[in-house]
Design a protein with these regions (language model features):
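Short, structured secondary-structure boundary patches
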Residues: 1, 63-65, 79-83
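N-terminal helix-turn-helix DNA-binding core of bacterial DNA-binding proteins
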Residues: 3-39, 61-73
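Alpha-helical residues within the helix-turn-helix
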Residues: 34, 51-52
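Short, hydrophobic-biased segments on the C-terminal half of alpha helices
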Residues: 47-48
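Conserved segment of winged-helix/HTH DNA-binding domains
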Residues: 69-85
Length: 85
């Protein structure tokens, strides 16, 4: 499971979520699909994998799931990779 973030699309999603707009508001699966020109089910899969590893957290707004970075968890995983896990 720790290899999950190494997928190029997932890394790009995490990077995008650092930008001011997405960082403040979070993003929906539809927004990810549009931004990266991927089908919505593929976007959902990427987001759920990132959530399962704790790198994303979710909130609900107007009945929609919004995804946000969990920078503390991302830093923790990065340290694990640096140690060779």
């Amino acid at each position: 499971m720790l290899r999950t973030p190494t997928d190029e699309t997932r890394l790009r999603i995490l990077a995008w979520l650092k930008e001011p707009g997405p960082a403040a508001d979070g993003v929906t699966a539809d927004a990810v699909a549009e931004r990266f020109s991927i089908p919505r089910p593929v976007a959902v899969t990427h987001l759920r994998l990132l959530e399962a590893t704790g790198m994303l957290r979710t909130s609900r707004s107007a009945g929609r799931v919004r995804y946000h970075r969990d920078d503390m968890r991302i830093a923790e995983v990065a340290r694990m990779f640096e140690k060779g896990w």
